[in-house]
Amino acid sequence: MKFYTLRLLGFLLMVAGLAACDMEQEIEVKLPVLPTQLVVECYLEEGKPIRLALSESAGYFEGAQPVIIHNATVTITKNGSQVIPLRFSVDVDNENEKITNYSSRHVIQSQPGDVYTLTITDPTGRRVTGSTTVLPPAPLDSVGYKFNDKPKESQEAYLYIRWQDDPSRENFYRLLTHKNDSTGGVDSEMDAEINDRLRNGQKIIYTTTYRFDRGDTLNIKLFHLDRPYYEFISSVEDARRSNGNPFAQPVTIKSTVAGGYGVFTHLNYNTRELIIK
């Protein structure tokens, strides 16, 4: 009996060894070589000059250093008549941690319904176009907070924001909240994309978890977005969450421009400052 047991054990060890040989296998995936595309990022804001970042795309495993495009012809046209040329100029925005390389001193002054059109042509003939319509600002009604029932020294508050949705149109929103830190910097506390698909024409109330302390200073911005920009930022967030996850589906960034990648939009928002006391 002992003899058969030893033979069986030896057989099982041999099978395990053979199976282990097949568990590791190098697979070489040949990625397609895609042509580079122009990449643009431009946000128009009321009362501010125009700044635009123009670079080109790169492969996933290539260096992250962007290729800055020189000598491109960049124009923004307002309502089909007023042409605003942008010139090459590298500017560093330390507050928002952005670098732009085309700009104009023209200050954005617009009304809801105004249309801005972007046209870019680089020296090799690549062309990018985009268009954005100015929306009315989101009517931010009220912001407030409420503490939990813990002892005062350990209490935390949740934040609530209220606004009225316009029933006459499809609406998309982005809600940002930043907190001033002790070093004079700013920490992001909330970034939410919201639509009115289930709340058309209703009072929208958005709340956070209990996360804020007494003495916190919060800066709240409610953006009114068009559908292309809403889909752009939603796809960017989906791509960020799936990056590095072997079980996640690949995500395609939904650009707001044609002929390349990126975003061109007008930002219209209301802002409030709230101190937790």
How would you describe each model-predicted region?
Residues 8-11, 32-33:
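Hydrophobic alpha-helical context, especially transmembrane and signal-peptide helices
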